[in-house]
């Protein structure tokens, strides 16, 4: 098995409710190493750029506004099967249908305010990591 990296966002709703520590703890309890992490406040340009694939969809503008509404915490996580395991840990986008014990089931408020984002492929993880981090901000552990 190869060690993989994935990208995580602790979103505005979770940051506002002081859930950063609880969510980071879940990452570590599930075998992820946090090899980079920082709090950022997205500009409109950053939010639109990050979600560019959704431009033109009806939820794009509200999503951009939501992601700009308060700081977020972006992280790079590492472990074997990181992308798949992280997606399992966070649960489905809609917290109502997420499995018990997942981050979204436990913390999300709604489908939009779903507390976390996770890369859906290794390719997207690499792109998303590079969007927020330089190589010198990522530390092997």
Swiss-Prot record:
The entry's keywords: ATP-binding, Cytoplasm, Kinase, Magnesium, Metal-binding, Nucleotide metabolism, Nucleotide-binding, Phosphoprotein, Transferase
- What taxonomic classification does the UniProt entry list for its organism? Bacteria, Pseudomonadati, Pseudomonadota, Gammaproteobacteria, Pasteurellales
Specify the superkingdom: Bacteria
Protein location: Cytoplasm
Function summary: Major role in the synthesis of nucleoside triphosphates other than ATP. The ATP gamma phosphate is transferred to the NDP beta phosphate via a ping-pong mechanism, using a phosphorylated active-site intermediate.
The answer on whether this UniProt entry bears the keyword Chloroplast reads no
Q: How does it assemble?
A: Homotetramer.
Q: Which PANTHER family match?
A: NUCLEOSIDE DIPHOSPHATE KINASE (PTHR46161), NUCLEOSIDE DIPHOSPHATE KINASE DDB_G0292928-RELATED (PTHR46161:SF3)
Q: Disulfide pairs?
A: none
Annotated CDD domains: NDPk_I
Question: Which Pfam families would you find in this protein's record?
Answer: NDK
Can you quote a single GO CC term?
cytoplasm
Per UniProt, where does ATP bind? 11, 59, 87, 93, 104, 114
Q: Which reaction does it catalyse?
A: a 2'-deoxyribonucleoside 5'-diphosphate + ATP = a 2'-deoxyribonucleoside 5'-triphosphate + ADP; a ribonucleoside 5'-diphosphate + ATP = a ribonucleoside 5'-triphosphate + ADP
Query: Its Enzyme Commission number?
Result: 2.7.4.6
Under which name does UniProt file this protein? Answer: Nucleoside diphosphate kinase
Residues at the catalytic site: 117 (pros-phosphohistidine intermediate)
Record's family? Answer: Belongs to the NDK family.
What is the source species? Haemophilus influenzae (strain 86-028NP)
Cofactor list: Mg(2+)
Q: Does the keyword Zinc-finger apply?
A: no
Q: Name one GO biological process term.
A: GTP biosynthetic process
Q: Which gene produces this protein?
A: ndk
Q: Which GO terms describe its molecular function?
A: ATP binding; metal ion binding; nucleoside diphosphate kinase activity
């Amino acid at each position: 098995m190869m060690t993989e990296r994935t990208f995580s966002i602790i979103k505005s709703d979770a940051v506002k409710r002081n859930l950063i520590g609880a969510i980071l703890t879940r990452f570590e309890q599930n075998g992820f190493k946090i090899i980079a992490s920082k709090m950022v406040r997205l500009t409109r340009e950053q939010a639109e750029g990050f979600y560019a694939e959704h431009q033109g969809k009806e939820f794009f503008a509200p999503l951009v506004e939501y992601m700009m509404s308060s700081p977020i915490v972006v992280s790079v996580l590492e472990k074997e099967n990181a992308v798949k395991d992280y997606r399992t840990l966070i649960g489905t986008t809609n917290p109502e249908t997420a499995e018990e014990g997942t981050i979204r089931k436990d913390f999300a408020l709604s489908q939009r305010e779903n507390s976390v984002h996770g890369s859906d492929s290794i390719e997207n993880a690499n792109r998303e990591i590079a969007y927020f981090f330089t190589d010198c901000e990522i530390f092997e552990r």
